[in-house]
UniProtKB/Swiss-Prot annotation:
Protein name: ADP-ribosylation factor-binding protein GGA2
All copies of domain VHS, residue ranges: 33-163
Lineage top rank: taxon: Eukaryota
Record organism: Homo sapiens (Human)
Protein family (similarity comment): Belongs to the GGA protein family.
Residues recorded as bearing Phosphoserine in the entry: S400
Purpose of the protein: Plays a role in protein sorting and trafficking between the trans-Golgi network (TGN) and endosomes. Mediates the ARF-dependent recruitment of clathrin to the TGN and binds ubiquitinated proteins and membrane cargo molecules with a cytosolic acidic cluster-dileucine (DXXLL) motif. Mediates export of the GPCR receptor ADRA2B to the cell surface. Regulates retrograde transport of phosphorylated form of BACE1 from endosomes to the trans-Golgi network.
Amino acid sequence: MAATAVAAAVAGTESAQGPPGPAASLELWLNKATDPSMSEQDWSAIQNFCEQVNTDPNGPTHAPWLLAHKIQSPQEKEALYALTVLEMCMNHCGEKFHSEVAKFRFLNELIKVLSPKYLGSWATGKVKGRVIEILFSWTVWFPEDIKIRDAYQMLKKQGIIKQDPKLPVDKILPPPSPWPKSSIFDADEEKSKLLTRLLKSNHPEDLQAANRLIKNLVKEEQEKSEKVSKRVSAVEEVRSHVKVLQEMLSMYRRPGQAPPDQEALQVVYERCEKLRPTLFRLASDTTDDDDALAEILQANDLLTQGVLLYKQVMEGRVTFGNRVTSSLGDIPVSRVFQNPAGCMKTCPLIDLEVDNGPAQMGTVVPSLLHQDLAALGISDAPVTGMVSGQNCCEEKRNPSSSTLPGGGVQNPSADRNLLDLLSAQPAPCPLNYVSQKSVPKEVPPGTKSSPGWSWEAGPLAPSPSSQNTPLAQVFVPLESVKPSSLPPLIVYDRNGFRILLHFSQTGAPGHPEVQVLLLTMMSTAPQPVWDIMFQVAVPKSMRVKLQPASSSKLPAFSPLMPPAVISQMLLLDNPHKEPIRLRYKLTFNQGGQPFSEVGEVKDFPDLAVLGAA
């Protein structure tokens, strides 16, 4: 048949590659938008489908094939609805969707509806008429799409299309502009004006020049898109590999768990090393986009930290068991990766000062990244004026020391102080307690006047005398917690940011005397919340330990998506069975504004009720 020749001629110009796999969410909205049982088309479903196409990175490539399947439906109403969705997408789904539809691969699917050899023998006249009308309208509205014009002209030559249809004056969907407002043709104002002038000309040489200009612009845009795609792919690969590396290294400190497979760990590490020059090349090629460059540098910081942590572990500076040696304090691997510089950025109870002066140390810390790593105890660069491990939220000051303008500490005994803090010589102190001689310079109100309280910001390194105390060895997985029937306590609830404290049915596994509590943080605010740091204090007759939080940031709330939740375990040892009192300090950033809140959790249930729950 004639249409067969058209399809064969068209297909010969491109690879016969099958359509990509559809996305479930796209199918869901398309099924609603093309439901043949509806008397009228669901325009809200069409709008949601278009939004999903624009949101999903693979939407512009998957959607045309989903639409082609619907257009070829034996049910007339479903096919007509799908053609309406196709027109809507051509108006609202951007250049990438447009380019997919303008390929011969997709145009062949429309030709099949018209060809008696394929579906034309049983497709209704209304469906075939709408397909012809759409193809003709595209040749009018998109003269730069040569493939659409060629396909339409070949159909006319073969007699499939007898004459050009008349476009209805009262068309439901307005004709789209020749290209979107954010199109590549508007990026350069001079080229845009030149192209407009050439397209309006009746001289063949001007039209040829316009065609060459369009091809050059499209080529430039494709090269730009390829760069963006490579950058996004590389950054995503860095994040995924560092996450895997983090999880494998965390096995070294989980009680009773075998170490990770060394061969697999080595493969992940080597891949991380190979990604570093890739990021360097991307950074050198991304000089005109500050946001993209910042994303690459952030990924490089994350990758560098993962590599350094791997080297620390493989050099034997981290031991098997529950605890990491003094090079890492007792900061868990997961916490290190949640917020590489979180201690310095969000914890106002500390003042980590890195001495960059060669006169004091003889070595210069090479970069801010290395300073951050040094503050976490995982850098080989020398650090002074700061503490590690249990002192993440504690500092030891010498009254005679003075701070230099560059942030260093002019203190001749800085090395000695650091050694004192890391050695086992200081007097024993209870787990997670801050010595009253080293009260932080920025303590929540009421703390200095309440010497019976101590502050805890996370799982800190235990002192020598507390190695055998329960909390030093206790770790409760989140999935093992069984919620109690008791209602949760509201810890904080302002500006859409809410923190609840939940109770568990049982104590910590193997340590029934340790009460397990669960903090949950969520946000219904339109702005994201980040750099979240939660600290707690209990009377000295009790002990408390905060396990790492699942995250340090919450996205902006969307009514179309379930709210994100941060979870953090709180372990409480109350050996004297006293009424529970708990104070907290909360710091976070919301909408670009920093917040620092202090309060006390009240209305704890009686111990008898708590134990029976």
